[in-house]
Amino acid sequence: MDRRSLFVASCFALVVTSLSFGIRAGILNDLQGHFALTDSQISTIAATAFWGFPISMVIGGMLVDRLGMKPLMYLAFLMHLGGILLTIYANGYMSLFLSTLMIGLGNGMVEAVCNPLVASIYPENKTTKLNHFHLWFPGGIVLGTLISFVFTNLDWGWKAQMGTMLLPLAIYGYLFSKTEFPVTERVKSGVSEADMYKNLLQPLFLFMMICMLGTAITELFTGQYIDVLLHSVSENAILILFISSGVMTLGRGLAEGVVKTLTPTGMLLGSAVVSTLGLYLLATQDGGMLFVSAAVFGLGVTFFWPTMIGFVAENLPNTGAVGLSVMGAAGMFAVSLYMQAMGGYYEGLVGDMNDVEAGRTVLRTTLFMPIVLSAAFAGLYVYMRKRNAA
């Protein structure tokens, strides 16, 4: 087993996932104009990737121990390929809906396989390596937003932008086809399937799953919908996503030192506090301060997703691949519901106020998420210190 090749292939698979978010965030307005879609329709299309993701993630998490990782990665490849091509040749709302669903299903399968894969091949350093793996999510969004920005200014269109995803898709498909996969940690350790499902009912796991709803909404709703919400405030609203994602990429690359200094629970508490400040600034500032706000927000959400997954992998290992998948699926499902609700809310606000105030109102409404998380993670920090000291 070549764990370096497996890790590199996993990173390329996550690049495809993140490009789908970054590029789609950058072309939402183009799609809306080209196909004459309403605000509600475009928010539903954007949300589809988020509920296709959890469906696939839960199914993948339940099957990965039985079928093995390799067949599920082939399925992820086919979903990605079909979704990209269907988007390029879309002719209206329904084809965009279906193509986004396919990409979401592919994205979920990547997470369902690659999270337990990384945890299995780096058992001695799970949280750090999951942060290194997940740096390619904001890293891919940086690439995606840069592609979207450059291609739009060159008038190359949204179809060409979607086509760029085919290169990393081909790379991860080739690498995985040539590499042998390990069994998951749960299978290796001999934990029964019944015990794995029983461990999903542990109070600590349920607490982390509920917190995942808030961390995912704070990070992913804001990132995916920021061009729509703030395009009236800044001519280059997509660059706000570029800056916040760039900060996240750098931060996750430096995760090893942060994990040793703060511990995972300290990282989560600090992330919640800083993301509260960042989201508040995004909702209240304009001009050059918007880009400063984006950097603060990016720093705040940097460690949310991988550290939540890493915490479960390290402290609740008997929940297995299903536990990691349920965490991610819960977060993505929450984002899909929240995005659809906020799409209708935003559309209603535009009738009563200008676009600028409507976008800011949506962000201010979302602010309660990191505020609640700050209190929750403060409690978790105290609890884990007492438990580890016992």
What is each stretch, according to the model?
Residues 159-177, 360-382:
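Symmetry-related core transmembrane helices of the 12-TM Major Facilitator Superfamily/SLC fold
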Residues 47-62, 242-254:
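Central cavity-lining transmembrane alpha-helices of secondary-active solute carriers
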Residues 5-39, 115, 222-227, 338-342:
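Extracytoplasmic
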Residues 36, 68, 89-94, 123, ...:
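Helix-breaking motifs and short loop linkers at transmembrane-helix boundaries and internal kinks
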Residues 99-135:
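Cytoplasmic helix-loop-helix junction between adjacent transmembrane helices
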Residues 24-25, 201-249, 338-343:
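Extracytoplasmic gate region of multi-pass secondary transporters
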Residues 55-94:
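Conserved MFS/SLC helix-loop-helix module at the cytosolic interface between two early adjacent transmembrane helices
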Residues 124-125, 129-184:
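Helix-loop-helix hairpin linking two adjacent transmembrane segments in secondary transporters
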